[in-house]
Amino acid sequence: MNASAPVLADPHPVLAASAPDLDPGALDAVRALVAAAERPVVLSGAGMSAESGIPTFRDAQTGLWERFSAEELATEEAFLADPALVWSWYRWRARMVRARRPNPGHDAVAAWQRRTPGLEVVTQNVDDLHERAGARVLAHLHGSLFEHRCADCGAPADVDPGAPADEATAGSEADLEAMLREAPPACTVCGDGLIRPGIVWFGEMLPAEPWDRAFAALEDCDLCVVVGTSGIVQPAASLPFVALGAGAAVVEINPVETELSGAV
């Protein structure tokens, strides 16, 4: 399998069924794997943050999500066509995340890492809830809502998304309406480009360094725990199979079955 930084692929639907309840024997087996692991990796996806009130990328598009297609906004073409709309959309998402709190799942991962310093966290999420729970994150595969750079010269930019005056309005229709059509700032380094979100959009290359760190960790781990990821978006969906190929145990924690489920 090629370890070079790949391109974020468009999602393709897969058939999923409700996962069966985990029996006590399986729970005991997972506990034993966790207790014995010295180099575990937690690979987290959007489901990890759903209990914090952050909608998953593919949640039913009701309310606000009916107004805009997330897939259509998450492209370079969308930013070039309407930079103010895309910029406002991502600032709104960052403000919503800022008003949310880590959930017990984030806390459990952070506590496990304190007990097992060799544990690495690799996430597909663009929020900062793992960090706010106290975990050290090895790689944000798809970037971060809280990092920005120039769309032309690539220079990093320090941009504060701000917070709603009332945190209860974060992620609301009113907060989005207040932010829509805010133009992105100009780059202070080159003076020509616009500042864009530090997110990996569909069709873009994943940042090489985070991908290389994640790939190396999965090749070297003795346990991979996959939490809340649909297994749809490549290349991140291939990482558990890297661990399997290297002889590691893989545990999947998901409310539905994925393409990985039949292999673990």
Residue spans for each PLM region:
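Conserved catalytic core of sirtuin-type NAD+-dependent deacylases
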Residues: 1-264
